[in-house]
Amino acid sequence: MRSENVNIRPFMENDISNKVRWINDCGNNRFLHYDLPLDEDKTRVWFHKNKGRTDRYDAIIEYDSIPVGIIGLLSIVDGRAEYYITLGESQYKGKGIARDASVLLLKYAFDELKLREVYLYTEVDNIPAQKLFEKCGFVKYRLDRNSAVNRGQFVDRYYYVITASEFGSVNKGK
C-alpha cells in the first residue's frame, strides 16, 4: 500500500531491531503500554507467534523506502479492529507521514478486509495523537477513566471510532 512517498508493508523478521529501538526510545514510549524495555529475543518470539495470524495485521511505515515506524490492526473480528501506530524516527515526525500511513491502513481495513469500523484508545494527555486521529476522521466517543495502567499509574483514555462510511466522506480523493 503506497501513497506518494509513504508505503506500508507487512512487518518482517528483519524489522525486529527497528521495532525494539523505536519502542525503547523515551521520545516514543511515553504513551505506549508495553512491558519495557523490549528486547530482540522476546520480540522475535512475539513475531513467530503472531506470524500468519488473521486476527491482526502488523506493518512497517516506510518513507522513501526508509523504515520509520510501525502501524497495524489488532483484534480483527466481527467487522471491527483496533488501530495502533508509532512513528519511531523523530526526524520524520510532523511531516504528515503518520497521517498518510493511517489513511493507507484504513483504506486496507475498509476496502480489502471489509471492516465496518476501526477503533483505538489513546491517553487523554496524548494531544499530538488525538490531532492525528481526528485529521484521519476518527470520532472521539467517550472517556474511559482509569482504564489502563502506564508505568504503574492508572490513566484515563479516550475511545475513538471511525466507520467505513465516515472514512469515505472524510478521505475522498486521498
Locations of the language-model features?
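Conserved GNAT-fold acetyl-CoA-binding loop/helix
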Residues: 27-46
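Short, hydrophobic secondary-structure boundary micro-motifs
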Residues: 30-32, 59, 169-171
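Hydrophobic pocket/interface hotspot
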Residues: 19-20, 28, 43, 83
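Acyl-donor (CoA/ACP) binding surface of acyl/acetyltransferases
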Residues: 1-18, 63-174
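Structural motif
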Residues: 26-27, 54, 113, 136
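A short helix-loop-beta-strand connector motif used in the catalytic cores of GNAT acetyltransferases and
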Residues: 48-60, 69
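Short, P/G- and charge-enriched loop/turn segments at secondary-structure junctions
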Residues: 46-48, 147-148
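Residues forming the ATP-binding cleft of Hanks-type serine/threonine protein kinase domains
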Residues: 23
